[in-house]
């Protein structure tokens, strides 16, 4: 990972998102704080990001395993903020909330983004929160469905996120890994955002 950030810095890439699905503290054990040895590994990656100018961003995925719900929301928000604080204290200055490949209500995603965005802003030196929605590429639009009575569509995300202009929504293009082409941007703008 450190060598990837160095490589990214050489090519003027500005961010490395740490979001391995097999990393328990990102995913299956997202409610648990990092132990000291794992936290030191994160600190080293943060430093490598600072040195290479390819900023280290840490992601949490609280929607896949033992997912956050409306009934657990208040307690789980405190858990996530405590974890963000732990990571902030070792130098992390950008955070990502992941909801990809998982179910859940768009309104709950937006609520959590709103509260985490407020936390980020309260710190004064944290970059904008990034959010990976369930529909993160054109291929995912075709997989989208209804979850807990809400449509999992790009339009529904835009509706819920209009009041969160600083939260950066992730979109990978036509598929999960896809070349950046102007036609992809035009298609997204014209097909999913009503030209916005």
Predicted features and spans:
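Aromatic-enriched hydrophobic runs in primary sequence
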Residues: 1-5, 11-19, 54-55, 97, ...
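Structural recognition of alpha->loop->beta junctions
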Residues: 11-14, 78-99, 150-169
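Catalytic-core regions of glycoside hydrolase
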Residues: 28, 102-196
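Structural preference for beta-strand elements that scaffold enzyme active sites
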Residues: 14-17, 53-57, 94-96, 126-130, ...
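Feature activates predominantly on carbohydrate-active enzymes
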Residues: 1-85, 89-93, 121
């Amino acid at each position: 990972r450190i060598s990837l950030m160095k490589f990214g810095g050489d090519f003027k890439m500005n961010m490395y998102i740490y979001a391995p699905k097999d990393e328990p503290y990102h995913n299956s054990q997202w409610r648990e704080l990092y132990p000291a040895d794992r936290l030191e590994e994160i600190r080293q990656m943060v430093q490598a990001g600072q040195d290479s100018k390819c900023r280290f961003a840490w992601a949490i995925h609280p929607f896949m395993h033992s997912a956050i719900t409306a009934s657990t929301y208040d307690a789980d928000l405190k858990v996530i903020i405590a974890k963000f604080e732990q990571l902030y204290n070792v130098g992390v200055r950008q955070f990502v909330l992941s909801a990809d490949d998982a179910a859940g209500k768009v309104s709950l995603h937006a609520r959590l983004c709103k509260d985490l965005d407020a936390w980020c802003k309260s710190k004064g030196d944290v970059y904008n929160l990034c959010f990976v929605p369930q529909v993160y590429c054109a291929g995912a639009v075709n997989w989208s469905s209804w979850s807990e009575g809400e449509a999992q569509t790009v339009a529904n995300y835009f509706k819920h996120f209009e009041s969160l202009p600083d939260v950066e929504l992730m979109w990978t293009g036509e598929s999960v890994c896809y070349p950046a082409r102007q036609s992809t941007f035009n298609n997204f703008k014209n097909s999913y955002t009503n030209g916005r």
